[in-house]
Design a protein with these regions (language model features):
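Juxta-kinase regulatory segment immediately upstream of eukaryotic protein kinase catalytic domains
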Residues: 9-43
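Broad phosphate/nucleotide-binding scaffolds in NTP-utilizing and phosphate-metabolizing enzymes
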Residues: 10-24, 56-68, 72-84, 101, ...
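An alpha-helical support segment within catalytic cores of ATP-dependent transferases
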Residues: 29-37, 164-167, 183-226
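ATP-binding glycine-rich phosphate-binding loop
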Residues: 42-58
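Active-site acidic catalytic loop and adjacent metal/ATP-binding pocket
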Residues: 53-64, 69, 104, 209-228
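A conserved alpha-helical element in kinase catalytic cores
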Residues: 72-123, 140, 145-149
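A glycine-centered beta->alpha junction motif in the catalytic cores
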Residues: 110, 122, 126-140, 183-191
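A cross-family kinase active-site recognition segment
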Residues: 140-197, 219-221
């Protein structure tokens, strides 16, 4: 069993920001996006930035009250994977009788995704979906039996919708994708200066290589991280 690691600095202070682009959110301003919304979608909206882990999200509201979410993807997200996400939304909406699923609002050309360039030259994909108001599950109470049954049913329906997507999950190179662990760790292990910690990492990687890697091609690969 690997003992707990005490809190200490393992990487240089600016390491994450400067070397791991998939963890960097886009940095578009409201001033950048308001004219872009009108140009691409023909909409005149006010914008308010929303929380986001790897993507940049904005609440977009028209004067007539119609509300949307403008999503700017991380520069590492591929068009193929985002198209699969849209496909999953559409299939889920068809199967969920009582569910509310965000619907994509196409641009003037009828496209669900538009390419945009940031000031630093990075390419991002932009899409607009209708906003769905609601309460986060963590803030909703009580979690009654009926509520949990409905939640489980919804998760099962979404799983069924994803199973109907004809293709295999697109290949990704995110840090937390286990099928990329070998190349990821080989790239970033030189930054680990603590010899004891480095030993644990190498031993874990060796164990993975000997026991899991030979079986990977036989295992099913999911579309999502299962962190619902």
């Amino acid at each position: 069993m690997i003992p707990p690691i005490k809190h200490k600095t393992i990487f240089p202070a600016n390491y994450m920001k400067n070397t791991i682009p998939e963890l960097e959110r886009p940095a578009f301003s409201v001033q950048d996006l308001i004219p872009l919304l009108e140009e691409r979608y023909g909409l005149c909206c006010t914008l308010e930035e929303l929380p986001g882990e790897r993507d940049q999200n904005f609440l977009a509201q028209e004067k007539n009250g119609e509300t949307y979410v403008l999503k700017i993807s991380n520069s590492c997200e591929t068009l193929e994977f985002l198209q699969v996400q849209n496909d999953g939304l559409e299939r889920s909406a068809k199967l969920l009788k009582n569910g509310r699923v965000p619907k994509v609002f196409p641009n003037k050309n009828g496209e669900s995704l538009s390419s945009v360039m940031s000031e630093d030259g990075g390419q991002h994909w932009m899409r607009l979906v209708y906003y769905i108001d609601g309460i986060p599950m963590a803030e909703y109470s009580p979690h009654t039996r009926d509520f949990l049954l409905e939640l489980g049913s919804m998760c099962g329906t979404v799983t069924k919708a994803l199973h109907e997507i004809p293709d295999s999950p697109p290949s990704r190179t995110l840090l937390w994708e286990m099928h990329n662990v070998q190349e990821t760790m080989e790239e970033y292990m030189p930054w680990i200066k603590d010899k004891k910690l480095l030993g644990w990492v190498k031993n874990s990687l060796d164990l993975y290589s000997r026991t899991i890697e030979p079986l990977e091609s036989k295992l099913r690969r999911g579309w999502i991280h299962n962190d619902f």
